[in-house]
Amino acid sequence: AAVLILSGGGLTYAAENGSLAWFFDSLSRETGSVIPSKYVDESYINNEYKGSVKVITESDAKVSFDLKKVAVDGDQVNIAMVITYDDFDTEKYESFDAQMQIIEGGANIVSEYAGSTAPGDGTSLTNKQTMSDIVYKLKKKNAYKVGDVITMRCNSITLFNKNKSSDGAVTYVADEVDGPWTLQFKVQDDMQGHSVDVSGIDGIEKCTINTKGITIDIAENAAVDDDSLENIILEMTDNKELKDVVYGIGKTGDGDSIQRMELNFTKPIDVSQVKNVWIDGRKCKVK
């Protein structure tokens, strides 16, 4: 699945707006996507995670994890967090990232993910912080509900240093900070998923829409143009059409001859205002 890395440089959103507000403003700025505020689910942004997070580690590295959002929808979990690495060398490295796994019984139960990370810009987040907003697809449906405990593991922190060679080519050199860190926390919210009627489109088995994005399941051998799926239009209840609202597009198989297309919104959408989803020029009703 695709992971969009945002530069975050030069942004000046105030910290008091909240980390999620800063993150989505950063994402909108980077992608050029504009979603009118009347269609944005502001409560999803403003209701940051308030529960306790238990962290277990034997690592000496000064790394902390601050959860901002934990929400579920069937076999998907949206987890947004700020990661702070106090010993991050800003002179030597440009950015850092933490690859997280959702685990049960020591085994990874995530089959794919799509989302983005944004390094701190010195205003809303320090330059020793990174924020991620990831939708994880689980290997089993309805694994969690609000109030359930999720266990995540981060085996290491990856540090990225940009190098430019004599021919002008830019490469990224990665170093590792060893963990592992194990996090436990409760599911806070629901992404309010709805099914979308795609019975009129050959090759598409299922489509769902929730606050965070759209999921399209495609039959493995279907002749479906991927580019057409990226050109999603949301028709709202007031007949306004929203275009260019998705990013973080990822596509992988799930082992059942189905390919899943993940399309995340640049800001959380108030799904109650979405009347139809236009896919490849065809109107699909939100149920």
Predicted features along the sequence, with ranges:
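Hydrophobic core
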Residues: L4-L6
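Alpha-helical, hydrophobic structural elements that either
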Residues: G10-K287
